[in-house]
């Protein structure tokens, strides 16, 4: 500034020195601040007061240190005078002369618009407009004072300004220093531009603005950015942060006392967040581009002009290391372009923030959605540590989030843009270990999945340190989406009660499974979602209608077994077990399917058929040579397609049929019998299978009698319920027992361990249970076994020998449970024994021999009997056994194990 190099003396020379500067600010109608040109930093400034004139004082707010002080209003015509100078001088070059300098340092002089004194005399212009007056008592003893006197007389004659009629009260502003409800004030403007004057610049990104026409004086913080500030010390002084003064000057030189428009976007405490619009540009973006500011996440979401513009401007300054970014080190890129952007197929959704995709190479990759956090338990919602947590159902909104992603993405191709790789982290006392994570932006049809999830309130946005660049490339859109979700009370941000999902997991719970079985059988095809694939033929399903989880086994096929971890060893999987599992996963995992439940096994697993898009999964596995047809398929409606699929796979000699060789058909010579075997089959209903392969049946012919008795008995009990705890059970006594389904059945007490443990046998169904005595009662005489005998009769299979090995026996029992439990069969008594009659059992529809089917599958061995009437059937059983041995099925997988010393293992030839 020229005045910094040559200034007038305090006494004032005869010919004052002409100095130049740029008007920074107009303090009032008779005082301005001028500055010089910047050279390596903010330039020096000085205040110039106009000589010989007086303008009204502007309003002043009472000092905060004087609570009883009152605000001083504008004097009449003070604000018009200030505005006259502001519009004429701000940012313009002026020249001035100093005529007088007080002992306190105040400088008085003349100011001219332009580079020399030939320009407009500002004092004369003010007086001529009636916005200022000559100082009282001043004598017109020089040309300048004479001209002021003439200007004042002309203004009076023309009744301009303060000389007009009236007291000038209409020129006094009603200044409003505070706003009672800033949020309501901001919302009332609906983000429409408001005319304003910037009255003060606190730092590069915080200003004081006068909003027009209502004269609200408000502090405005620029949305989305923050400049270096001036730190206030304990002694009251201010210490600027690096580049704070430069940033302040940058904003001052462009906005101070300029006419602008402000978009009021939000509020923070009593301060308003906004964007200042000027005809020459957007100061927010300019500050970023010049390296005077950085983006801030907490307010960038409310920026209405496009947050991506701010990020781009910041990136521009970072790349060039401008000012506050002079020490910036960009993150190292360690990914090839092909690894950074790719298209992949979504195979699985993991909770609510990660997916598993299949790459074009066939490899699988887990992708985490960048910068979002799935729903989680917090505060009072944290459950008892002793209770097993099921995140999908127990964490509020986790199920909704997972379902949103599942329905949108499963089986679809998505675009993946990797944003960052989160390195592996070790476990601490409070945080578990994390493996390396690939975090990316995933889009489908141009929609950012993470943004959609956040906008529905089904996820939240992670907050980072300001200098952390490891974040989503669309981070600002995520913040904006979260702000919308919070404002609209969506999902996690809702004030309503959180949704509760009471999902019963009946996997492996035999008693619960038995209760559900009749409902699922009657339902026919039920809708389901495949939650997990254990193996090619074993799945976990969620049934939405029944709100339960079940383990489901595919019927009609024999799929290769996968590897199993047993105590002390790892059992290797059968060939092609992994391929079968992968095939099923790719086809049905997390897809919506339809299932037909036919039966259940001993472990409470349901058995049936699974359909997806009209295709039967059992048939598809056989068709792709990943399974073989099980003999139980013979009585199903899908036997023909299964058989044709298997035949085609055999001919191709693929996978499980790679070493298939057609076996020559052995002719079995008929054995002449002296005595014919008696075959008189009667219909029965199989109700229970025991662990030693015995079973209980009900006579179909007396079934209606049992139904009528049960109906009458339950009606009687409902009218006269037993008193809880009044019945004292004794071994061998008949009673009534309350089963898990809440109904009463006839039973017999087998053992009393304690009042809390009473062993009972249900005489009409053949199953056993341990109950407390409080769930037992005396059997009413009207429903005793004299009225209707016990309906469950125990039988054993004839002509077969049950394996002594526990695993092998379990396989045989499971097979029988799948095939005949809760189904109608045909029974023929072959011979008697000390324990129970031995019988052959046939399927009611196909007339296939159940026991013979077990032999064919290599699940049991033949019991050779010498009676002549059984020779024909024994021969058939032995031939089936030889076929199973040749095919190395189940018991015979390692050849004929029945060596000379096999007796010690419980086997006999």
From Swiss-Prot:
It is found in: Cytoplasm; Nucleus; Melanosome. Residues 17-165, 192-327, 340-495, 524-659 form the TNase-like domain. Endonuclease that mediates miRNA decay of both protein-free and AGO2-loaded miRNAs. As part of its function in miRNA decay, regulates mRNAs involved in G1-to-S phase transition. Functions as a bridging factor between STAT6 and the basal transcription factor. Plays a role in PIM1 regulation of MYB activity. Functions as a transcriptional coactivator for STAT5. Keywords: Acetylation, Cytoplasm, Endonuclease, Hydrolase, Isopeptide bond, Nuclease, Nucleus, Phosphoprotein, Repeat, Transcription, Transcription regulation, Ubl conjugation. There is a cross-link at residue 512 (Glycyl lysine isopeptide (Lys-Gly) (interchain with G-Cter in SUMO2)). SMART domains: SNc (SM00318), TUDOR (SM00333). GO terms for biological process: miRNA catabolic process; mRNA catabolic process; regulation of cell cycle process; regulatory ncRNA-mediated gene silencing. One of its GO terms (cellular component) is RNAi effector complex. It comes from the Eukaryota. Disulfide bonds: none annotated. The modification Phosphothreonine is found at residues 102, 234, 239. Pfam families: SNase, TUDOR. This is Staphylococcal nuclease domain-containing protein 1. InterPro entries: Silence_cplx_Nase-comp_TudorSN, SNase_OB-fold_sf, Staphylococal_nuclease_OB-fold, Thermonucl_AS, Tudor, Tudor_TDRD11. Residues 728-786 form the Tudor domain. Forms a ternary complex with STAT6 and POLR2A. Associates with the RNA-induced silencing complex (RISC). Interacts with the RISC components AGO2, FMR1 and TNRC6A. Interacts with GTF2E1 and GTF2E2. Interacts with PIM1. Interacts with STAT5. Interacts with SYT11 (via C2 2 domain); the interaction with SYT11 is direct. A motif (Nuclear localization signal) lies at residues 320-324, 387-391. GO terms for molecular function: endonuclease activity; endonuclease activity, active with either ribo- or deoxyribonucleic acids and producing 3'-phosphomonoesters; nuclease activity; RISC complex binding; RNA binding; RNA endonuclease activity; transcription coactivator activity.
